[in-house]
């Protein structure tokens, strides 16, 4: 009991520190929820959350430009959002545990850029800075992600940059989503493909 109480108090203190970066209604942040700001900007709102939403996830903002928006009455389980650009999750969305939503490539396709990336990380780290404090993002492809209302993302999925998950769409567990998923369909696999179209009686009117 005492250990659980300690964990709860520590989480509350962490959430209070992070509150300057968050705009939210009456939504709830579970004790395991966390935000990692690799290059924090003190006067910026990084995360906007609507009402009646539950967040039990980890969000990493790779740069000052990142922004995550979550709508009303959504649930994000123990998943990881990695944002440099923009990730939008609309209303009534379920995201299960173990999924990763990633709006950029992290590194260039050119090996020479990656070599310089490693050297710059070492320089920054040895100076006591964030290891990506001076990362060259200009050579890294990044595109926003949109997950529309009433979608459901199963466990252990990977959603990559530039993807739109359509309204009411379902992504099966363990899928790797590299392309858009149409409204009211079920997609699965690696890479994810549409495997079923939901009937009219399962669609929102």
Task: Name these PLM-found stretches.
Residues 1-150, 156-159, 167, 183, ...:
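Domain-scale signature associated with acetyltransferase and cell-envelope carbohydrate enzymes
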Residues 163:
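Extracellular carbohydrate recognition
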Residues 166, 170, 175-176:
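A generic "structured core" feature
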